From Swiss-Prot:
Gene Ontology CC: one annotated term: motile cilium
Region annotated Disordered, chain positions: 1-32, 60-90, 388-412, 424-447
Main location: cytoplasm
UniProt-recorded name of the protein: Flagellar radial spoke protein 3
Organism (species): Chlamydomonas reinhardtii (Chlamydomonas smithii)
Highest taxon of the lineage: Eukaryota
Pfam family for this entry, one: Radial_spoke_3
Subunit comment: Interacts with FAP91.
Composition bias type Polar residues, residue spans: 1-11, 62-74
PANTHER family from the UniProt entry: FLAGELLAR RADIAL SPOKE PROTEIN 3, RADIAL SPOKE HEAD PROTEIN 3 HOMOLOG
GO biological process: positive regulation of cilium-dependent cell motility
Amino acid sequence: MVQAKAQQQLYTHAAEPKAVQQRRAKYREDETTQTLPTANIMFDRRVVRGNTYAARILPADATQTQTKGPSPASTKKRTTRTLPPRTPEAVDGRRHIDIQTDVYLEELTDTVPEADTSTQTDAFLDRPPTPLFVPQKTGTDAITQIENGDLFDFDFEVEPILEVLVGKVLEQGLMEVLEEEELAAMRAHQEHFEQIRNAELVATQRMEAAERRKLEEKERRMQQERERVERERVVRQKVAASAFARGYLSGIVNTVFDRLVSSGYIYDPVMREVETAFMPWLKEQAIGYLARGVVARRVVDKLVEDAAAALAANRSTLADKAASTAATVDAWAERQAKMEAELQGKELEAVRRRPTFVLRELKPAVASADAVEAAAAELTAQAEEAANAKWEADKAEAAEKARAEAEAAAEEQKALLEELAATAAAEAEERGEEPPAEPPSLPDGVEPVDVEAEVAKAVEAVPKPPVKEVTDIDILSYMMDKGAITKDAIIQALAVHALGDKAYTNHPAFAEAEGA
């Protein structure tokens, strides 16, 4: 940078002087030998215009014209002439190319004479085809006449075919009718399930709305809680500031006022006025007020007595009305409870009737009567086995409990006997005698405990539980668990039962087809 500044200080202008550049090269090739850049051939001087079949009109001395170079005079004149403005030279790595910018092509107007000439070449002659080999006839020809009906009887042969065709057509028509009815039933069934789905969708939307309301309520409560906490924080700050201010100023104010009062600069004019003027007047007024109070108390006592009597009378009347109202309400509640019980009983009976309807009354039946009876017998046997098992378990539990109690009582009696034996031995030792050889007996009224007898008595006292009644609900659940009845079969049977005579299975044609 220092060298550049020193270089700039040598000249009065800012730009550094440079050597003059030569615009022309020191050696230039002949213009006739230079290759022209690629351009549009429609405007190239070297391309002949006109029809290519026409004769070209060349100059008298074409060779001289081609080899003739530019004269020095023309070259000098061209160099001295002012050059027209042209496109700047291309940058390094690029070049300028002439392109066509005209809208239409040039029309060729030269007409070339034309003439038609034809010639015919004879086709090659092919070898004639080889004649077919026909062997010489051997043997004797015979002729047989076949009359109509000899080989094929149309009326006899077409009858079974016609019967088959007519039967197939009728069967196909019947199948199409049954298929249409089945499609109608399936469409109705689908619409029913669509209604159920829409109802479930509405319920889902209702639950989503409830959940959304809960979330909004939760957010609102949380916002309220945050606001409450903020208000409490502000209040605590204010209370703390107020307490600090009171604690800081209380001592100062009290000290200042005590000093002023003790010095005599401050006195209470109200106190002086009260002592001199107000207290005597107050005494007189108090005496008069007390006298009026005695009279007022007497009047109030009389009014209170009258009001108490009226209140007692009103209370008795209201108590009677309340008792009658309570009786009416109790009667109404009893009627409502009775009606609700009847309604629940009807609903329970309807629920109990549904399995009976599905198993025994639904047409077509989802299961045979023998299968239902077999399932009922199996469930009854299972119920009896369960009752017996429960009875055995109850007896075992009662026996275990009775055995434990009897063994505990036996242990107590054994301990009592040991205690009596020890007491008798101690008394004999005090008397200087030997202990009695016979074991002591139980006190009067105390019977020895027999564990096995108590256990047997407890087992005999256990009642046998009743066998659970087998209902149609149990039978239906049992058969569905075993796979004897499926949900699809029940739904299809209900749909057919609901359609009645409209169902394809109840159609007489379907019944005849099944019988066939």
